[in-house]
Each structure stands twice: as structure tokens, then as C-alpha cells.
């Protein structure tokens, strides 16, 4: 049988690659919980080549552990520049529901710490799915508010990221009932800053709601999945998103 155990990388084997690298991109699982990512950054520093490369890290922003006595904040200053992409689903406490058991306060605090690092920009990124699509403008508004606190406007950015799509993917936008879509579409017109500053993005998301066909079977699968997950976690979808109440039955 094939082994399910991960073979241990010998990071030293990547020395020749690092010497010629212009961008080091680290991803997860949870990127900042993987020791080998720190070993790679340390090797780049030891080889004196980190100053020549851009560092790109995608993280949930939920933790910043130390490995060998150092955390990510110790490594960022050694690189030419850095972009931290913080993966979220909602702006604010709503994020705690999907990204259970994360805490929004911790995520935002870490994002601010990333932004305080030298030559570092922070991007918030999310997927476009049945639960998030009605609230994505709130992420844009949250980023606009953050920009007001900092001298550089390009320090903070956001991206709506990947559209959840494909056969059998119950969290696709096609699972959203038409009455909820109407509510979300009306709500989109309340986000004047987002509409004005990023109209093409606003229009793309609005048209997803308007044009994607409703799939009743996929919707039922999604609701079953949500109800089972809520039962396991001790959470409740409609406590956070009351618009789903007509379609939700607590198990």
C-alpha cells in the first residue's frame, strides 16, 4: 500500500535553486505552521540571497509560531519585499463561522503586524461561494477603512479570488435561492465606494448572482452539509445569516 506518511524534505537540496530565485512563494495547509517553510527562509538568509528575492506567503492569519526561536516577523526584513495574502471568507466576526474556530480579532491583529513589517503589503483574499457572495463588498469596505489608517494606500488590498464552481460542488453560487439573491443584489447598491472604485469587480459579482442558474438539488446538498457541520460544531448558520432561515432545519 502507498504510504500516507510525508517524506521529510532535505531543505539543503534546494540551495542551488534558491541562489537563482527571484520569488519565494510559500503556501500551506496553514503555511505558518509548516517547519520546512521556515527552514527554506533560513537557508535563503544563510546563503545571503534573500535580499534578492520577493517573499510571497499565503496564510489564514490565525497563528505566528516560532521554529528554532524565530517567527515569520524575524524573516520578512531579510527579503527584498514581501506580500502576505491573508485568506478569509468574511470581514469581521462572520469570518469566525466559516473559519471555525478562528477568531477575527487575532486574524486582523496579525494582518496589522504583517503590514508593519518593512517593504510588506497585505492582501485579503476570499473565495466566491454561496455563503460569501452576498458579503464580499464588506471586505472591500473593510480594506478601504484600513487604508485610512496608513500613509500608503497600496499597503492594503483585497481580491475576491476563486469562484467555487464545478460538478457536485454544493457551495457554488448556483446553490443560492432566487429570493436570497434578490436581497443580495439590492444590498450591492448600498456599497457606493466599492461600486465606484472597483466597478468591474462589483459588476462581475453582481452578474454571478443575476445570471447563474439555480440548482435545487445542489442547494439541498449544501443545506444538508451545513446542518451536519453545525451539529458537529455546535454552531448555527441562521444565527449569523438569518436570510437562510426558510431553508434551514436544525438537526
Role assignments for model-derived ranges:
Residues 13, 36-43, 68-75, 97, ...:
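A short acidic, amphipathic alpha-helical/loop segment
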Residues 9-16, 112-116:
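Short, basic/hydrophobic alpha-helical segments
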Amino acid at each position: 500500500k502507498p504510504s500516507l506518511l510525508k517524506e521529510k524534505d532535505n531543505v539543503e537540496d534546494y540551495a542551488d535553486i534558491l541562489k537563482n530565485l527571484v520569488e519565494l512563494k510559500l503556501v500551506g495547509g496553514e503555511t505558518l505552521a509548516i517547519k520546512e517553510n521556515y527552514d527554506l527562509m533560513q537557508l535563503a538568509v544563510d546563503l545571503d540571497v534573500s535580499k534578492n528575492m520577493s517573499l510571497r506567503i499565503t496564510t489564514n492569519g490565525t497563528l505566528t509560531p516560532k521554529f528554532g526561536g524565530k517567527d515569520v516577523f524575524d524573516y520578512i526584513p531579510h527579503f527584498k519585499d514581501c506580500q502576505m495574502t491573508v485568506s478569509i471568507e468574511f470581514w469581521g466576526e462572520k469570518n469566525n463561522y466559516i473559519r471555525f474556530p478562528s477568531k477575527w480579532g487575532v486574524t486582523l491583529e496579525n494582518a496589522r503586524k504583517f503590514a508593519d513589517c518593512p517593504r510588506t503589503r497585505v492582501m485579503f483574499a476570499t473565495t466566491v461561494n454561496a455563503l460569501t457572495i452576498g458579503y464580499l463588498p464588506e471586505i472591500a469596505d473593510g480594506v478601504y477603512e484600513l487604508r485610512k489608517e496608513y500613509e500608503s494606500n497600496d499597503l492594503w488590498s483585497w481580491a475576491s479570488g476563486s469562484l467555487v464552481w464545478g460538478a457536485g460542488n454544493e457551495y457554488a453560487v448556483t446553490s443560492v435561492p432566487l429570493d436570497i439573491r434578490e436581497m443580495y443584489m439590492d444590498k450591492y447598491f448600498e456599497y457606493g465606494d466599492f461600486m465606484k472604485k472597483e466597478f468591474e469587480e462589483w459588476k462581475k459579482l453582481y452578474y454571478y448572482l443575476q445570471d447563474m442558474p439555480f440548482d435545487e438539488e445542489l442547494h439541498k446538498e449544501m443545506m444538508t452539509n451545513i446542518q451536519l457541520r453545525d451539529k458537529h460544531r455546535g454552531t448555527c448558520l441562521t444565527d449569523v445569516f438569518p436570510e437562510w432561515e426558510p431553508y434551514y432545519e436544525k438537526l
